[in-house]
Amino acid sequence: MEIMEKAKILEAAGRDIIYLCLGEPDFPTPAAVVAATHRALDAGATSYTPSLGLRELRQEIVHHYRKRYGVHLEPEQILVGSGTSPLLLLLFAMLLETGDEILLPDPGYACYPDFVRFAGGVPTRIKTTAQNGFQPRPAEVEKLINSRCRGLLINSPSNPAGSVLSGQELRTLAQLPIPIISDEIYHGLTYEGEEHSILEYTGSAFVLGGFSKAYAMTGWRLGYLISPLTCARTLQTLHQNFMICANHFVQLGGLAALRHAEADVERMRRLYDLRRRQLLK
């Protein structure tokens, strides 16, 4: 964000800037989402909602995972929040005591280590290479597991490498004796092969998902955390104490995205892929 702010100053001074610092779509939010949010505001959807999020939205997320991945969830497993970042922070607050470790891919999203440290934990980096797709391999992860290790964070499709873990790779990682935290915010933007969720292979993982990337809704700040039922109430309690709930009308926009914007997502995905292919020529 600091780099972007400096770039904005240079742009205002007349410099021609190409932004490579943020994973932000350059498409507008789908019209159906904007229209639904206008209607929600006109109807007075400006109150608190349940801290887990609107049940209708959570049920639609359940439907989305069943349709896309064949995964069966309960609405109570889903915590809707104002973006995935605060939800990840709450998750680390639940998992970590001072000095506990979280295993992180390196390279990886620059904010991951800060979230771990803020919760009192120690970020332990797993060095990855181009040969393994810049993704952690089970053998390397196992070497780093110790009595203070509280989880492995994976990101597929990944930031910054863009690499994707295969179904078999996810299946193997799911067998590790530590919780898997899967950041799936870039799901919907895969260009080759099949897209899989860690939830296809284990019911004990934590999954971060949202609307920012695939639906071009970065500024709306809407995401969700899927957790095992045994952890859902604790996460809900943390959320209602620190954040209360996500914005009511924004949640209704997210509902419209899931119900009416899949064609927009596919159109944007095809255009991203076209740009990618042009860049690689």
Model regions: which residues?
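A short helix->loop->beta-strand "cap" motif at the edges of active sites that frequently abuts
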Residues: D100, G121, L176-P179, G203
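A short helix-loop-beta submotif of the ANL/AMP-binding
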Residues: F118-T124
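Active-site phosphate-binding strand-loop segment of PLP-dependent enzymes
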Residues: T124, T128-G193
